[in-house]
């Protein structure tokens, strides 16, 4: 799990906590999750439902891409129900372009391909195109999920059960014990072979 850098653009606000209290909790949860994954967590300043899809955010994310030089970028598929996920989908693609073609403030560039993760809130038109075997890391990932309050305590959706069960189902479909699925943009969905 070396080199994992989740970048949370927003923080949510459940009824029993103030926005500021939950922001602190989410930052601590992100750190706990990434400590287990041997990574670093970044959380930007935007509140739940308030992530703007604008040039300022795109440039901020592009700066992060250039600074950390990821091998690949995983982000949200476009969403039919979550405004922030939908904005993130487009922000990251534009930030990838800025980072790879224009570069940061110093003109330094970095390109990394973008993959879209499977998420129940973003499943409209999601095509599980790439199956990745996560069997070796499943126990660690499962343990890391326990650091996320909403995953373990939501009264609205059984996140933990859903994602661990989905990993098993995707594993069965791919001949593995556990797997996670990713999508790519349509123009990346091609195979080039010398013969069939």
Regions found by a protein language model. Name each.
Residues 1-68, 195:
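Active-site rim/loop-helix segments in enzyme catalytic domains that contact anionic ligands
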Residues 18, 35, 52-196:
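Metal-dependent de-N-acetylase/amidase catalytic core
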């Amino acid at each position: 799990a070396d080199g994992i850098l989740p970048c949370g653009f927003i923080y949510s606000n459940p009824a029993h906590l103030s926005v500021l209290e939950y922001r602190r909790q989410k930052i601590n949860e992100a750190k706990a999750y990434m400590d287990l994954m041997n990574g670093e967590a970044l959380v930007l300043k935007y509140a739940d439902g308030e992530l703007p899809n604008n040039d300022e955010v795109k440039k901020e994310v592009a700066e992060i891409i250039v600074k950390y030089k990821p091998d690949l970028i995983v982000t949200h598929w476009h969403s039919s129900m979550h405004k922030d996920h939908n904005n993130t989908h487009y922000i990251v693609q534009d930030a990838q372009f800025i980072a790879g073609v224009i570069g940061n403030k110093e003109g330094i560039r970095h390109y990394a391909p973008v993959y879209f993760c499977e998420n129940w809130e973003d499943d409209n038109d999601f095509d599980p195109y790439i199956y990745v075997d996560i069997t070796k890391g499943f126990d660690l990932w499962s343990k890391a999920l326990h650091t996320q309050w909403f995953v373990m305590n939501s009264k609205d959706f059984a996140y933990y059960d859903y994602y661990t069960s989905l990993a098993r189902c995707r594993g069965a479909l791919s001949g593995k014990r556990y797997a996670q699925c990713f999508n790519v943009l349509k123009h990346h969905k091609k195979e080039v072979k010398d013969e069939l």
